[in-house]
């Protein structure tokens, strides 16, 4: 199975002190990125082997203010674009109970087994 998890983590892993794969846990840190591979679909095959995969990654960005969330999103978005991913969607979500500002963004790329990305 083709995946680009290492490439995604390299793009976002040092943007803030709390970058997590999977679920967010608590909100004790002022900024947090939670990410996951949200789709992995065989896009092309030959001789029974996968040659291209369509990969989608979701980044959820949490911060204590809308400005901090926007700034962290802008840096993550730039890094993901440089890594070969195309942003498909980004939206601000309201977290009224916690007071945390949340931006959810989805990125897409086609990849071969060598990690080359295509749009």
Cite the ranges covered by each PLM segment.
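Short, surface-exposed, polar/charged, turn-prone segments marking secondary-structure boundaries
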Residues: 47-50, 61-65, 86-90, 115-117
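Small/polar-rich, solvent-exposed N-terminal microdomains that initiate assembly or binding
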Residues: 1-46, 72
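Residue-level signal for secondary-structure boundary sites
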Residues: 43, 67-69, 113-115
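Mid-chain, well-packed structural core segment of small domains
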Residues: 53-85
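Short, solvent-exposed beta-strand/turn "edge" segments of beta-rich domains on protein surfaces
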Residues: 46-51, 96-98
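Oligomerization/assembly interface segments of phage tail-like spikes and tubes
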Residues: 51-64, 101-112
């Amino acid at each position: 199975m083709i995946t680009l998890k290492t490439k995604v983590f390299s793009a976002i892993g040092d943007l803030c002190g709390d970058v997590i794969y999977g679920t967010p846990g608590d909100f004790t840190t002022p900024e947090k990125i939670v990410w996951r591979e949200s789709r992995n679909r065989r896009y092309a095959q030959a001789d029974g082997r996968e040659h291209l995969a369509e990969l989608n990654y979701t980044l959820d960005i949490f911060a204590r203010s809308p400005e901090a969330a926007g700034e962290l999103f802008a840096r993550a978005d730039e890094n993901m674009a440089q890594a070969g991913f195309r942003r498909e969607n980004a939206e601000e979500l309201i977290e009224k109970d916690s007071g945390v500002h949340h931006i959810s963004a989805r990125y897409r790329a086609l990849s071969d087994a060598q990690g080359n990305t295509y749009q």
